[in-house]
Structures are given as C-alpha cells and as structure tokens.
Regions:
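A structural motif corresponding to the C-terminal end of an alpha-helix
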Residues: 223-230
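Short secondary-structure junction motifs
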Residues: 21, 82-85, 229, 356, ...
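Hydrophobic or amphipathic alpha-helical targeting/insertion segments
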Residues: 104-107, 113, 125-131, 137
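N-terminal glycine/serine-rich phosphate-binding loop of ATP-dependent small-molecule kinases
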Residues: 1-109, 121, 140, 233-236, ...
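Carbohydrate-associated surface elements
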Residues: 116
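Active-site core segments that coordinate phosphate-bearing ligands/cofactors
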Residues: 2-7, 13-15, 26, 127-198, ...
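Flexible loop residues that form catalytic
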Residues: 93, 239, 428
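Structural motif
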Residues: 77-80, 226, 415
Length: 514
C-alpha cells in the first residue's frame, strides 16, 4: 500500500457482517459521515426444521468483494485512494459458529447461525448433569443461561456430530470460532499466517469466557468438554490485531472487533452507566450499560461485556435482552405465507387500520429469548375473528416487536431499580415510522432514532479509530448523531391493557415441541 499524503483525509473502514448481508463502509474521522459503502446479501440455509446455517466461504467471498468494490467506489466517486484508510474495524453477527481446518483453510461444516435450534437435545443432555436441571447454573461465571442460542452448544454439537470435525480434532488441525474469528483469520492470511483471535464482546456470548477474568474459563470448558486449544485468543475490542494480507487494502491494520450489538452501543454513544440502545434487524437486541459493575439479572436478562476499548482501559459491562424474531417476522409474512409481496408493503398496509383488531402475534419461530427463555415456545396468532383483515395481522406482527421490547425494558427496570426514560434505537427497521411510533406508544417513553441508522458499523469504526497506534479519533469529541423523536400518543390505560393481552398470548405459545 502506498504511503498516505499529509493532506489526505483520515478515513476509517468497517466490515459489517450481519445475518442477512455483508457490507463494507467507510467513515470520515473528522465528521463521522459515511463516505462510501458496498453491500452483498447473504442467504440462510435451512436443511431441516429449526436448523439455520450459512456458508462460511460465501460470507468470506462477500467480504472480500465488498472491500474491492468499495476501493473502486472511493476512487471513482470521491477521488480517494485506499491509503486514506487509517484502520478497519469489524462488527459481526454474534454466536454464529464455524469450525474449519487450519491447514486447508476450508470450513468443515456450514456455520451454525445464532437462530439455529438443533442443539435443543444437546441442552437437554447438559441439563441432566446439573441439580434440578437449572439452566442458570453457570450464570455466576459467564452471565448466560444454558441455551441453544449461545456458541458453546453449537461447538459441542459440531464435535459430536460432524465426522470432518472429529477427524480435524484428531489431526490437530481444528479451529473453531465465531464469525469475527473466521473473518480475521482469513483477512490476515488464512493458512499462511492468519491470526486466530476474538474479542471480549464476542467471547462473552459463547458461555466459555469468565466475565471477571475475561479469559476462557477452565470450569466452563470442562462442563462443555471443549478443548481450550481450539478456541481463539481473546483480545480487547480496540487494538491493532494484524493487517490485511492481500487485495486492494493490503497492509491496512485491523484495529477493532465487536459483536454487532456492542458496536451499536458504542455507535450510539451509550458510554455512560445507565444508557441503553435497541437495535432492530433480523432480531432485536437491547443493551443497557452497567459500567464497571457486573449486574446479575433476576428477571431473565443476560449479563455480558459491553466493550473494552484497549488493553489499558476498563471494561464496561451490560445487561442484554435479545428478541429472536423482529425483521424475520416481516420476512415470514412475505416468504412463508405470502401476506405481502414485498417488505416495503408492510408499513402502508398496517397503516390502513388504526389498531390490530385485538389480534396478537407471538413470532416464537425458534422459541422465545429474554426474558422468557422458552426453547419449546412456538409461534401463535390469537384473537382472530371474521372481521380480521390482512392489515390487522401485519400490524400485530409489528406490535409484537414492540411488546417484546417492552418485556425487556420492564425486566431491566426491575434489575437496575430505575426505568429507562428514553429508548435510543438503530438498525435498518427503524426507517419504519409506524414501528417507531408504536414502540413509543406501547412502552410509554420517547423513542430516539438517529438519522444515520447503521450505528453498528459506526461503532466498529470508532473502536478502530481510537485504537493505540491509529488514534485518528478522540472518543470524547465524537458527537451523538442527529435524531428524530417519537413520543407516546396513547393513554396509560390503553397501553397497559394491550400489554396484559400480549402476556396472555405469550403464555399460549409455551410448551410446543419440534
């Protein structure tokens, strides 16, 4: 890579590898404005009911293509060279797990996506080992309940069920990791010197990292029978890990790595204890910054690492509530039952009616996450009458996202002793004005939407820009993004009455099996 001119702007790139797409975005370190980007959709593979996979090589190819295409766009649209990039950060879908051979560089099985439910039987076997089948028995170490959601069960399933994984383990060539590890290993050389690392935010979603030591825990690894040598080295969220090994961005340092929801916390400037954000994408994820305190939830939330910006800085912890199905419910309306032809029809269709007609939709397609943690829950639609129209069901699907967010907000208020007085939001779905208004109405607090909704990528870029040796950003100088505010418009009585019926519908979803 050619040296950068003294007059060239300092730009920071961010790889945003999500459930539905891979992207590369470039931001100005002076203004935080996005300069250029490229995006490629990523398909999910569903070989059996409850199974959700993605092809690791397809994801990696998409990331390389995004880097190449953005380099071209920078040149053609902005007359900028890639040597203006000071560093690259990574924001990735969490919990999704891959096993690969370090000699060949090839995946040994498709990546098991966070939504996947195949490990329900693995969970059942593990719970048989603990007193009273207590799924919270490890929370004092890792902050998480035993659930198919988290990576340890996915790794255990791969070790138990995939012959190629077993053979690589015997041969000493097996590596496992979440998607950040797969990306960084390939970007830094793959079989030819690739670095096998992860960061504290991604590691905190595996059930294998000790929240206090921020290292792989011997007791946890023993419980799941996962050899520690298979796992990546844990780093902070902001430091130079290595450099891009090839392509138009060869030599540019990779200087941050964060799970997408943690990156959004940073991108929203939720840096103070008590601040929170909710990201709306395939799922919905609400994180509450608890500062240096590890808060043990008694109301169905999980304790996780918020971020750690460099080896010499303190770790910030968070409480999190995760909703499995948010945007995925809209995709289901389109692809599975044909209620709409395009997702863009959903908002105008829901606006045709002023209420859901007392219809309640619980989209528990793969169980319910926080605060219920019911892996045997399945989707239900309640309250249908002969008057029910397509618009009512679509609006009920929209309201389901908002009700699930309220479930989490109420749990957070109980755990922290103080209710949130506002909700900062981000993610692609926040462009839906009706969804944002319903969220304000059903939670009873203002909803704050930034004009630049893709804050996960911005957070990864910020973490890269403040890394030691990069230092093109001062985190204290970064302004919170301009925003729109949605304020509640319904009475407290109406809000609480509808929420009571939602809780009734949720109870009806429990107890179903695949």
């Amino acid at each position: 890579m050619a040296p950068k001119s003294d007059k060239a702007p300092n730009l920071v790139g961010a790889i945003d590898e999500g459930t539905s797409s891979a992207r590369f975005l470039v931001f100005s370190s002076q203004t935080s404005r996005m300069i250029s980007s490229h995006q490629i959709p990523i398909d999910k593979i569903c070989p059996k009911e409850g199974w959700v996979e993605q092809d690791g090589e397809v994801i990696m190819d998409a990331v390389w293509e995004c880097l190449e295409e953005t380099a071209i766009k920078l040149k053609e649209d902005n007359e900028l060279e890639v040597n203006c990039l000071s560093a690259i950060g990574i924001s990735n879908q969490r919990e999704t797990t891959l096993a690969w051979d370090k000699k060949t560089g090839k995946p040994l099985h498709n990546a098991i996506v966070w939504l996947d439910m195949r490990t329900a039987s693995t969970m059942d076997t593990l719970l048989g080992k603990v007193p009273d089948r207590d799924k919270n028995c490890l929370k004092n170490l890792c902050g998480l309940p035993i659930s198919p959601y988290f990576s340890a069960l996915k790794i255990r399933w791969l070790l138990d069920n995939v012959d190629a994984v077993k053979e690589a383990l015997e041969d000493g060539t097996l590596l496992v990791g979440t998607m950040d590890s797969w990306l960084i290993w390939n970007l830094t050389g793959g079989p030819n010197g690739g670095i096998h690392i992860t960061d504290v935010t991604n590691a905190s979603r595996t059930m294998l990292m000790n929240l206090k030591t921020l290292q792989w825990d011997n007791e946890l690894c023993k419980f799941f029978d996962i050899p520690k040598e298979l796992l990546p080295e844990i780093k902070t969220s902001s430091e130079v890990y290595g450099r891009i090994a090839e392509g138009p961005m060869e030599g540019i340092p990779i200087a941050s790595c964060m799970g997408d929801q943690h990156a959004a916390l940073l991108g929203q400037k939720c840096l103070k204890k008590g601040s929170a954000k909710s990201t709306y994408g395939t799922g919905c994820f609400l994180l509450y910054n608890t500062g240096s305190e590890i808060v043990d939830s008694e109301h169905g939330l999980v304790t996780t690492v918020g971020y750690k910006l460099g080896p010499n800085n303190d770790v910030a912890y968070a409480l999190e509530g995760s909703v499995a199905v948010a945007g995925a419910a809209f995709a289901w309306l389109k692809e599975n039952i044909g209620l709409v032809e395009t997702v863009t029809e959903i908002e105008p269709l829901a606006n045709r009616v002023h209420h859901s007609g007392d219809v309640y939709f619980v989209p528990a397609f793969s169980g319910l996450y926080a605060p219920y943690w019911q892996s045997d829950a399945r989707g239900v639609i309640c309250g249908i009458t002969e008057e029910t129209q397509r618009s009512h069901i679509v609006r009920a699907a929209m309201e389901a996202i908002c009700f699930q967010t309220r479930d989490i907000l109420e749990a957070m208020a109980k755990d922290c002793g103080t209710p949130l007085y506002k909700l900062q939001v981000d993610g692609g779905m926040t462009a839906n004005n009706l969804l944002m208004q319903l969220q304000a109405d059903l939670c009873g607090i203002p909803v704050i939407r930034p004009h630049m909704a893709e804050t996960s990528a911005l957070g990864a870029a910020i973490a890269a820009g403040v890394a030691g040796g990069v230092d093109v950003w001062d985190i204290n100088d970064i302004q919170a993004p301009a925003n729109d505010i949605f304020r509640p418009r319904v009475t407290e009585f109406e809000r609480n009455n509808r929420y009571l019926k939602w809780k009734m519908a949720v109870e009806r979803s429990f107890g179903w099996e695949i």
